[in-house]
Each structure stands twice: as C-alpha cells, then as structure tokens.
C-alpha cells in the first residue's frame, strides 16, 4: 500500500503520467466534462469531498508551475479564491473566462469531479518539473 497521501488509484495514475506543461483539472460537481476527457468522479454527496480537500491532496504530489482560474471566481466566490491562494502560495495564477476554462478541459489529462457545490470552484493545474 502507498505511503503517500494520494491513494485514489485513478488520480495517482494520472499524476504519475503528467509531463511538463500537461494539465489536470479539479472542479465542482456541476462542471461539464467534455467527451474524451477522462473524468475521475470522487463525489459522494453534496460537499463531500470538498474542492479544497481534493486540491490539497493533489498538490501534495503534483509539481505545479501555474494554475488557471475563472475570472468569475473573483466576485462569485471570493472565499474559495482566498483558500486557493493560501494553498498555492507563490504559484502564478492566470485568470480566464469560465467559457474558456470549459474549452480547455479538452486538453486536460483528466478532470477530477468533487462534491463541491459552490460556484466557479474549478481549477486547471499546469504541471511543472521537479528539477
């Protein structure tokens, strides 16, 4: 059994397969996932697990060089934005329109669906390198 924090086999496999500039997305329960994008559904009920719980877990193993967030989170969910900023530290953020984020999911290695039920709780993580 793994000793690391990510024990979900599908998430672990995607992280292991990530290369430089590859993307992985995490989102709320309502985010539409394009056909062809791998969906890893970890939601079990409203709010469980939360977006922040899943993001924290994935950040424990994935080297992230940049994140993408929807512009709309600034006004529609500032509490979630503050929580994300606290987790990612100095990692650069690029704000994009929510419609663009939905399109960019086509390029993601996978989308992890959480039980989050707050608006614009979605992120695209761009993989960095550890050297």
Curated annotation (Swiss-Prot):
User: InterPro entries, from UniProt?
Assistant: D-ribose_pyranase, RbsD-like_sf, RbsD_FucU
Binding-site positions, substrate: 28, 98, 120-122
SUPFAM superfamilies recorded: RbsD-like
Residue positions of the active site? 20 (proton donor)
Q: What are the subcellular locations of this protein?
A: Cytoplasm
Domain of life assignment: Bacteria
* Pfam families xref list: RbsD_FucU (PF05025)
The catalytic activity, as recorded, is:
beta-D-ribopyranose = beta-D-ribofuranose
Give the UniProt entry's GO cellular component terms.
Answer: cytosol
Pathway per its UniProt entry is:
Carbohydrate metabolism; D-ribose degradation; D-ribose 5-phosphate from beta-D-ribopyranose: step 1/2
Tell me, what is one Gene Ontology molecular-function annotation carried by this entry? D-ribose pyranase activity
Q: EC no.? A: 5.4.99.62
**Which keywords does the record carry?**
Carbohydrate metabolism, Cytoplasm, Isomerase
Role of this protein: Catalyzes the interconversion of beta-pyran and beta-furan forms of D-ribose.
Q: How does it assemble?
A: Homodecamer.
Stored PANTHER family: D-RIBOSE PYRANASE
Protein name listed in UniProt: D-ribose pyranase
This chain's source organism reads Latilactobacillus sakei subsp. sakei (strain 23K)
Which gene holds the coding sequence for this protein? rbsD
């Amino acid at each position: 059994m793994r000793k690391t924090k990510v024990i979900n086999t599908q998430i672990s496999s995607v992280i292991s397969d990530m290369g430089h500039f590859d993307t992985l997305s995490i989102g709320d329960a309502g985010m539409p996932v394009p056909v062809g994008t791998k969906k890893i559904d970890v939601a079990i009920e409203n709010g469980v697990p939360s977006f922040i719980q899943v993001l924290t877990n994935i950040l424990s193993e994935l080297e992230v060089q940049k994140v993408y967030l929807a512009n709309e989170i600034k006004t529609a969910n500032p509490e979630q934005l503050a929580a994300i900023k606290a987790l990612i530290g100095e990692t650069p953020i690029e704000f994009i329109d929510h419609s663009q984020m939905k399109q960019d999911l086509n390029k993601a290695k996978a989308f992890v669906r959480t039980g989050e039920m707050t608006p614009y709780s979605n992120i695209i993580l761009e993989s960095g390198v550890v050297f």
